[in-house]
């Protein structure tokens, strides 16, 4: 018996023994969700309009080579649904999350998924391990509200786990309270737009001359990539899969007066999101909606291996930088995004009193 077979057999026995009869015959309506690539998020209700449902999602693992900067640096990436990060899935507390995980025959490695929001050993990883050419269906109950990451955890041990995550295999789930988001006093909070920013550290090996190396296959890249990863010094720290993925023409959009919810995840390293010229009106820094949000933050902290959420109402037009406020990572390694906000300037909030001019000598005292 192989290790993989033993793990799956033990997990299956545990599942059968622990599963009550009601879970085998859920009398709930089903909703099939068409996922979209980040930073966008699929349509969803902020306040649940009916009782719990079975929310159906489909995630397809894809191994592919991608370009991660304007220099043409290539990564042998591993992804969910072809994007880094994988899609954000939105449900409500009490819903059942039913995920079909597909590993196409065109892939070369086993993959699975660990849901941080789920309750059960390995977050479902032992029950979702699929070889190329296989698919599996996992269902778990959303019992805790908040934003939670998911990631690949093949086998649960050894170098495959950090390699798959550092190659792009993570995403997030948002479990909303059934009656929606609220402030510390219980007042309802609403957002007009939502964006999902997935921060990712990459470790691209270099040759003897310091140039980034390119590999034909994932297996070819494995040994050198692991050596680079063990030094814990990323060559790139990016938002949504590559340098400038969310800047310029790809900037996230908003209008003055609109409230935007920003979901931010990092599966590996700590991060310090900061909206340049804006604030976190309400921030769930640990990502858990059962905790009251902090208010009026200038910079917030996302622990490695977690996700957080921040709500902000834009009051001025312009281009807002959204950065990891480790400025080396923001400006040198790529952790920068933009919000492009349209509207009318409020001169009461900010105005240039005098335009730049030559320095004037100060009058001497009599």
Predicted regions and their residues:
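Sec-dependent N-terminal signal peptides
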Residues: 9-17
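Sec/Tat signal peptide C-region and signal peptidase I cleavage site
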Residues: 19-23
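Copper-binding active sites and cupredoxin-like electron-transfer domains
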Residues: 24-366
